[in-house]
Amino acid sequence: MKISYSMLTHNETDSLLKLIEFLVKHKDEEDEIVILDDYSDNEKTKEILDTMCSIHEIKFEQRHLLKDYGGQKNHLKNMCTGDYIFNLDADELPNKWLMKNIKTILEANPTIDLYW
């Protein structure tokens, strides 16, 4: 089972770096990190994204939001290749217990397609 950890970004800084580092440390090898950025103009954000995407295998694209949040989320979804998509805000960290057990939870509940 492959999970896509996906997020939309725009000018996040320290929280984005913490989240990427957390995901790299806690995701399984077959999982992916997917980021769609709304052309951040914050230099620190650009530096974080450039550095982390060059060090780690992160699927990254930039696309203008153009006041179309639904279109942005759909584009992000289409970038993902996992069996499940774990949508994150760039300023949140998933629980360590959840990261360790998410696949067991999903496998134990095969008829459920959405978790909140």
Language model regions located:
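A conserved hydrophobic helix/loop-capping motif in glycosyltransferases and polysaccharide synthases
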Residues: I3-E12, L19, H26, L36
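Acidic donor-binding segment of Leloir-type glycosyltransferases
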Residues: I20-Q62
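Active-site phosphate/pyrophosphate- and oxyanion-stabilizing loops and adjacent acidic/basic residues
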Residues: E21, E47, N74-H75, K100
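A short, glycine-/small-residue-rich helix N-cap motif at loop->alpha-helix starts
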Residues: H64-G71, K77
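Active-site nucleotide-sugar/metal-binding loop of Leloir-type enzymes
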Residues: N74-Y84
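Short beta-strand-to-loop acidic/aromatic patch adjacent to the donor-nucleotide binding site
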Residues: G82-L93
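Conserved donor NDP-sugar-binding/catalytic core segment of glycosyltransferases
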Residues: L93, W97-W116
